[in-house]
């Protein structure tokens, strides 16, 4: 069973409270006054913004990312939430679509190729070098200390230095890349809206397409304990054996 812990209208109130507190404390965050104005507008319009991604570090600690830099954090298993948006170093408040935990670091990615890296357990998310200029939908550790980011129109970048610089990986597809997972074997699986699945056996340095193209747009993938890869797309759920 499921129990609602937080909705967008509540998040707007939390955002307003955090922004007002930051302004009152003369916060150095340049986005605090803008956050106050935006939260007041959203509350007046009764307009909640969506959550887009979640990362859980333990049964108690989690961070949720969303539209317009919306970020919420819980340290008690979701009993209470705090707005964490001003801890994302993005005064223009871009959408945040995905995240990855790589070693002790947390990466968050979003619009305009923006990548944020937390080295303090999620307390702060300064920007690192952007990975291109198009929207990024997700990130994944490569298993050797590197990180991949992927997104719109076949965008795929790899960094081996914590996001200080990025190398573009040329792919034969211009479809949006939607998900990436690490298989039990250590290989990396990359999925796209075109129905093509790519696989890497060298920590994400190169990818090859699997022979069969699925007859649907792929939005997410996960590997079951028995090794089956479960694909979710616009036509339902499909199990694949590797």
Model-identified regions with their sequence ranges:
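Residue-level hotspots at or immediately adjacent to binding/recognition sites across diverse folds
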Residues: 1-242
